[in-house]
């Protein structure tokens, strides 16, 4: 059996009461104090996540922008230095290699932050499709990454840095930011639906920053709450809402797919055809009317006929209802449409509802 990968924070997990699980080959905390308490901490105060398992890929060289325009679905030319952009990397079929965030450090240097389990696959795909004068380097082992999320994130982080955090706009970032004596990159971004920051630092210093933030009274948060938080906010998870068989259009990520950009990106032709023909299926929110929790891969029925499948589901800690996302036949995606979810050997009533399930007050 292959030994599980560990983040630089791993030696500290036991000290804070982490229960760990195998997550895509990594030994990561599923919870500390408990999923509901952790979820609530992020929604009402702040919580700290170890996300050092995420991959970082460095793209450098004079042709970096045109290469990324070819590789990715969003319009890379629109990114200003010091800003980030959400992106999809597609196969020629329009299916998804990965979803990721691109950070523009200079006109000739970008960092791509990718899903942990996809890092090697993404890197190989990027090298295979290299164009022009660019270098592509997997620098994942060099970085630790923490996410401080919640309405009080700015107030807490400002105690540990001289950077004026209020000047960092959403998806903006600053480099060489001192946090607890460590040189970091601070980005105003996250995966929870709350305000917050993602902080990148040398791997060797990650534990120091982690403990400095926790010392401000912040709760450590595990993967369980990370999933319930992102699901309430309807943020896609690769392997569930996106995959090689699910296109970004089907997943409702049109905002990150610029079919009108001049550059021909990989998958563009297939996505244009899919859009012109009309989507056969799309991602919708569902709320259960009867008791039961929808889970990944549970079938969705209408009048005994299967019309789709659940991609993610949970009991919403914030709303106190059972919610899910489902990829279903476009003909049955009207709001209020009643459907049934196959839970074990029973069909449970549900209805299609607006998303996101949760949106923070600005």
UniProtKB/Swiss-Prot annotation:
Keyword Transferase belongs to the record: yes
Catalysed conversion reaction: N(6)-[(R)-S(8)-aminomethyldihydrolipoyl]-L-lysyl-[protein] + (6S)-5,6,7,8-tetrahydrofolate = N(6)-[(R)-dihydrolipoyl]-L-lysyl-[protein] + (6R)-5,10-methylene-5,6,7,8-tetrahydrofolate + NH4(+)
Cystine bridges: none
Xref: Pfam families: GCV_T (PF01571), GCV_T_C (PF08669)
Coiled coil start-end: none
EC number: 2.1.2.10
GO molecular function: aminomethyltransferase activity; transaminase activity
HAMAP family per the UniProt record, alphabetical: GcvT
Protein task: The glycine cleavage system catalyzes the degradation of glycine.
Protein name per its UniProtKB record: Aminomethyltransferase
Source organism: Listeria monocytogenes serovar 1/2a (strain ATCC BAA-679 / EGD-e)
Lineage: Bacteria, Bacillati, Bacillota, Bacilli, Bacillales
Gene: gcvT
């Amino acid at each position: 059996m292959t030994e599980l990968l560990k983040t630089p924070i791993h030696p500290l997990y036991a000290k804070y009461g982490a229960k760990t699980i195998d997550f895509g080959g990594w030994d990561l905390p599923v919870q500390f104090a408990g999923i509901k308490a952790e979820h609530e901490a992020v929604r009402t105060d702040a919580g700290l996540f170890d996300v050092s398992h995420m991959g970082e890929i460095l793209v450098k060289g004079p042709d970096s922008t045109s290469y990324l325009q070819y590789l990715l679905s969003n319009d890379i030319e629109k990114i200003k230095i010091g800003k980030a952009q959400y992106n999809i990397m597609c196969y020629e079929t329009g299916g998804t290699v990965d979803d990721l965030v691109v950070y523009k450090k200079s006109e000739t240097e970008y960092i791509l932050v990718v899903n942990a389990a996809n890092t090697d696959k993404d890197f190989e795909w990027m090298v295979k499709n290299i164009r022009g004068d660019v270098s592509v380097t997997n620098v994942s082992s060099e970085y630790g990454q923490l996410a401080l999320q919640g309405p009080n994130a700015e107030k807490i982080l400002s105690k540990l840095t001289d950077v004026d955090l209020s000047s960092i706009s959403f998806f903006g970032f600053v480099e060489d930011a001192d946090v607890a004596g460590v040189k970091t990159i601070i980005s105003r971004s996250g995966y929870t639906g709350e305000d917050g920051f993602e902080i990148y630092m040398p791997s060797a210093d990650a534990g120091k920053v982690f403990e400095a933030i926790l010392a401000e009274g912040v709760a450590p948060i595990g993967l369980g709450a990370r999933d319930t938080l992102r699901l309430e906010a309807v943020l896609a998870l690769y392997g569930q809402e996106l995959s090689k068989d699910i296109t970004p259009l089907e997943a409702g990520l049109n905002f990150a797919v610029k079919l009108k950009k001049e550059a021909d990106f990989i998958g563009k032709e297939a996505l244009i055809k899919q859009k012109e023909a009309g989507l056969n299926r799309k991602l919708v929110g569902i709320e259960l009317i009867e008791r039961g929790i929808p889970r990944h891969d549970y079938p969705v029925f209408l009048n005994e006929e299967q019309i789709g499948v659940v991609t993610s589901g949970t009991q919403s800690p914030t709303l106190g209802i059972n919610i899910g996302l489902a990829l279903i036949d476009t003909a049955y995606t009207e709001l209020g449409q009643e459907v049934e979810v196959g839970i074990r050997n029973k069909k449970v009533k549900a209805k299609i509802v607006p998303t996101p399930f949760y949106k923070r007050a600005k």
